[in-house]
Regions:
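Amphipathic alpha-helical repeat elements characteristic of tetratricopeptide repeat
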Residues: 18, 32, 43, 63-66, ...
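Short, cationic motifs built from Arg/Lys/His that form the positively charged side of catalytic pockets
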Residues: 42, 46, 56-57, 92, ...
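Amphipathic alpha-helical interaction elements
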Residues: 54, 96-100, 120-123
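C-terminal all-alpha effector/ligand-binding and dimerization domain
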Residues: 66-73, 78, 86-90, 106-161
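Short linear motifs at protein or domain termini
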Residues: 1-45, 51, 55
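Exposed, interaction-prone assembly regions rather than primary DNA-binding/catalytic cores
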Residues: 52-68, 72, 80-81
Length: 161
């Protein structure tokens, strides 16, 4: 379960059994096929997660998401790919937290932990610009409380990885 506290953000109150979560993604070092499966799974859920988050987002959470995005831009401007990767993970994790759904939050935590090295390699290979336009359009959708737009943008972002 997650809890939203005015002025401080959203917090995980209760976690689902670890054994349940471990069955979602293969344990151990991910092979290429595992990474493809995780990315495919994210493509299935990320757009709906974004739509749900838009519908539940508070002004404070929107401000937090915007602050994370500003840090993402700063990392890109400094060409700090390590920070860029970490902040990108934080951005997607924040969207999961905004849903106020503990299963979404924990699933994202698990999947993003596995994918963080892949995300870093993507930034090294393709450059720091890859996700930023999508993030900017997502924030616009959040500002407009437009779940359909958020779903479309996140779907395109997930497919573009």
């Amino acid at each position: 379960m997650v809890e939203t506290r005015n002025g401080t953000g959203t917090y995980v109150k209760r976690q689902i059994s670890g054994n349940y979560m471990l069955n979602i993604v293969p344990i151990g070092d991910l092979q290429f096929e595992d990474i493809v499966e995780v990315l495919d799974f994210l493509c299935l859920i990320e757009d709906s997660v974004a739509a749900m988050a838009v519908q539940r987002c508070t002004q404070e959470e929107l401000a937090e998401l915007q602050a994370i995005h500003k840090r993402l831009i700063a990392a890109k401007d400094q060409n700090d790919l390590e920070a860029l990767t970490n902040v990108d993970v934080e951005f997607h994790s924040k969207i999961a937290m905004i849903t106020q759904n503990s299963l979404v939050v924990q699933t994202y935590a698990l999947l993003l932990e596995f994918l963080q090295p892949v995300m870093h390699r993507t930034y090294v290979t393709l450059g720091a610009e890859e996700g930023i336009p999508y993030h900017e359009r997502l924030i616009q959708a959040f500002c407009a409380h437009d779940a359909v737009s958020a779903k479309n943008v996140m779907g395109a972002h997930a497919q573009n990885r």
